[in-house]
């Protein structure tokens, strides 16, 4: 399987289609009301329907933080195919959503400050399908532009696939992937004009950089 490429924080159907055209394997929707990239279930449904027609194999990922069952149900009904838990969810929370939504990919995101956080990430492998490592920020859950210490992550080899996030850009992606070998990458602020408004030139530059360095398979 080739490198998964997730572009997160979209709000516009045409941008979603254009980014899928460029080669994204997953599109992320922020379901956290405090985020400037927030989209409602109705907005997600509109984008999901557009993607289903043009790119049915592209994953549609809902990003949540400490969500209720009702919130998750609303976005599942809107057409997402993966649940990304980006808050303070526990192992028990993950198992509960795993049992409730067995057909959906379950991703647990962790904001990494130290090697202890990497050990915590590995503890989730029994109850999720995929892990995601993001940079820590005291006030923000994601889309901060802060990068991780890639060298410190080299020993991270969980039994589940994992995605690298945290300040990735078209300019630094090949450096990151020369040091690490995640199953996929997740970009948001690094390919934006403003929160929720993606810059298609930057997304194009991302794919050009990956292709130039033989990182697309």
Swiss-Prot record:
Keyword Protein transport part of the UniProt annotation: no
CDD domains the UniProt entry points to: PRAI
A GO BP entry: L-tryptophan biosynthetic process
Protein family (similarity comment): Belongs to the TrpF family.
Entry keywords, A to Z: Amino-acid biosynthesis, Aromatic amino acid biosynthesis, Isomerase, Tryptophan biosynthesis
SUPFAM superfamilies per the UniProt record, alphabetical: Ribulose-phoshate binding barrel (SSF51366)
EC code(s) of this entry: 5.3.1.24
Alphabetized InterPro entries for the sequence: Aldolase_TIM (IPR013785), PRAI_dom (IPR001240), RibuloseP-bd_barrel (IPR011060), TrpF_fam (IPR044643)
Disulphide linkage map: none
Protein name: N-(5'-phosphoribosyl)anthranilate isomerase
Pathway(s) where this gene product acts: Amino-acid biosynthesis; L-tryptophan biosynthesis; L-tryptophan from chorismate: step 3/5
Catalysed transformations (reactions): N-(5-phospho-beta-D-ribosyl)anthranilate = 1-(2-carboxyphenylamino)-1-deoxy-D-ribulose 5-phosphate
Gene Ontology MF: a single term: phosphoribosylanthranilate isomerase activity
